[in-house]
Amino acid sequence: MPLKSLGNIDPMKPILMFDMDGTLLDLAFDDLIWNTKLPERHAETHDCSLEQSQATLKAFYQQHNHTLCWYSSKYWTEKVGVDVLKLQYDFKNKIAPRIGCFELLEELKAQGYRCWLLTNADQAGLKLKLENVDLSPYFEVMISSEEIGYSKEFVEFWQILQQKHPFDPKHACMVDDTALVLKGAEQFGIPHLLTISQPSSGRPERHALEMEYPAINRLTELFTFLNAIKNKDVDVKTA
C-alpha cells in the first residue's frame, strides 16, 4: 500500500513497526481457522476422519512453516482443496483487536509517531482483517510480505522494504509475536525489538523464560519501552 501522510509527525521519534496477527489483533481467530475449522472442513471435503485431517494438515504446516506459502490463502486452497479465504470470511466476526490496541494507536498518533504495519498475511488476508478491524487510519505504510516476495523472517524482506520505503533501521522499533521475525529485523540492524507475551486470548500467557526478547502484554505497556529508548538517547547525547 502507498505511503500516506498522517499529519502530526515528529521526525525525531523512532518509526514504530507493528506486526498484525498476534500483536495488534488477537491470534485466537487464526488459531480457530487453522487448528479447528480448516481440519473440520478438510475432513468433510475429503470424507476422512478429523484425526486423519489433522495429521495431514500438520504435516503440510510443518513443511511450509515461515515461508510465503505458509501465509498464502491461495496456496492453501490449492493444496488442501478447501477455499481457505472463504472459510476465514465465514468466521470474520471472530476477528478482534488485542486489549489496548486502539488506545495505543490513538495515543501514538496524537504524539506524532510514524507507524508502519508489516504483516506476513497475504494481501487478501490483510484486506479481510482491515475490513473488520479498521487499523488503516493509524499507519502511513501498510505492507504484506506477499508484496515484498519474502516473509519477515528473512533479511531480504527488510532490504526490499528499505528500498521501497527508505528508513534508518537504527531509528526503528519492531513489535512482533514471532521470535524468528524479530531475529530477521535484528539481523538487518533494528535494535529496538519487542515481543508479545499472550498473542492469543485462547492460550496462556507465555513465561518470560520462553521468550528471547523483552515482552509486553497489554499494548499500552509499549510507552514504558519508548520512554526507556528516549531516556537512553538523551543520556547518549549528554554524555
Question: What are the functions of these language-model segments?
Answer:
Residues 69, 111, 178:
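Flexible coil/turn residues that form the inter-helical turn or adjacent wing/linker of helix-turn-helix
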Residues 6-103, 124:
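N-terminal helical cap/lid subdomain that shapes the substrate entry/recognition surface
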Residues 48, 82, 113, 167, ...:
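Short glycine/serine/threonine/alanine-rich loop segments
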Residues 82-96, 101-133, 141-145:
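Substrate-recognition element of Asp-dependent hydrolases with the DxDx(T/V) motif
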Residues 1-16, 106, 122-123, 127-239:
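Asp-based, Mg2+/Mn2+-dependent phosphohydrolase catalytic module
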